[in-house]
Structure formats: C-alpha cells, structure tokens
Amino acid sequence: MSHPALTRLRALRYFAVMPSLAPPLSDWLLLEDSMTQRFEQQGKQVTVTLINEGYIEREALTDEAALLPDEPRYWLREIILNADGEPWLAGRTVVPESTLCGPELALQQLGQIPLGRYLFTSSTLTRDFIEIGRDAALWGRRSRLRLSGKPLLLTELFLPASPLY
C-alpha cells in the first residue's frame, strides 16, 4: 500500500550544499529534537497513521542505500503524522536488520506510537547529519540517527497543513 504523501517524500531532491534558509524554515528543518514533541508544543494531539511496515530487500532502497550498511534486509516503517487529525508530516524510517538487536528491537513494535517518543527517550541517540530536500513547494529532511552506535535513516516530508509553511 502507498500514499500520495509518501510518493512525494520519495521524490525529494537533496541539496548538495546546505541552502540559506529563512528562520521559520530553518527552525523546523534543522530541529535536532523530537518533531513529535514540537508538534505537541503547538497544542496539537499527535497521532500516527501507519501506511507500511515490514522488511524490505536492499534493492528496494534508492539513494538511501549509500547512507546505510550493506545488508540484505531492512525494516521499513512509513507513516503519516497527524496533528488533531490533520496530516502534517510523512515519515519513512529505514533500519538495517543488524540495528534490530537488544533494546532497538522495540523499533519493530511501535505500531501507532510516534518514532520520536521512542528515539528521544534514549540516552544513546546521536545524529550524524541532517540533509535538506525539496519536491516542488514541499520541504523535507533526511537524518541518519544512531541508537547505541547502530544506524537508522529517517526521512520526513512536511505536508502543506504543517506549521512550517
């Protein structure tokens, strides 16, 4: 199953050099903390619509493959993050199978829980980078995060109703 917002997310083109961003854009796109928490700070109830979840083969990755270890399988989770029922963000998380051991096995059990609620409670979370991308008028970002040193890739597309615009 797919969703039009996830098609747009996969169409993001990333800037080779960090673009100059006005403060409202940079405040959202370069946020180091939880996007879920940021949405909740807007006074919104955040919910998850789960679109896809399960293992994919390496061949299903596009340019993401260059940012992750070479493995045969990856855990994929694609969601829409809603604020008071309105879609604000499309998210795609790709987790190498080798990351899914120990406490990180919980990444497969999130269900309707926003990823940020899990990630940002971990004292072992680090971020390698944030890449800024754009598809027509929509902005997005991609980050390689690490839990206990183990990588995962998170891509987020800000939808038209989000406060970024």
UniProtKB/Swiss-Prot annotation:
Keywords linked to the UniProt accession: Cytoplasm, Lyase, Pyruvate, Ubiquinone biosynthesis
EC number(s) reported in the record: 4.1.3.40
Keyword rRNA-binding: no
Pfam families per UniProt: Chor_lyase
Catalytic activity: chorismate = 4-hydroxybenzoate + pyruvate
Positions bound to substrate: 35, 77, 115, 156
Any Gene Ontology biological process: ubiquinone biosynthetic process
Pathway membership: Cofactor biosynthesis; ubiquinone biosynthesis
Gene3D superfamilies assigned to the protein according to its UniProt record, in alphabetical order: Chorismate lyase-like
GO cellular component: cytosol
InterPro entries (UniProt xref): Chorismate--pyruvate_lyase, Chorismate_lyase_/UTRA_dom_sf
Molecular-function annotations in GO: chorismate lyase activity
Family from the record: Belongs to the UbiC family.
PANTHER family (alphabetical): CHORISMATE PYRUVATE-LYASE (PTHR38683:SF1)
Purpose: Removes the pyruvyl group from chorismate, with concomitant aromatization of the ring, to provide 4-hydroxybenzoate (4HB) for the ubiquinone pathway.
Name of the featured protein: Chorismate pyruvate-lyase
Organism: Klebsiella pneumoniae (strain 342)
Organism ancestry: Bacteria, Pseudomonadati, Pseudomonadota, Gammaproteobacteria, Enterobacterales
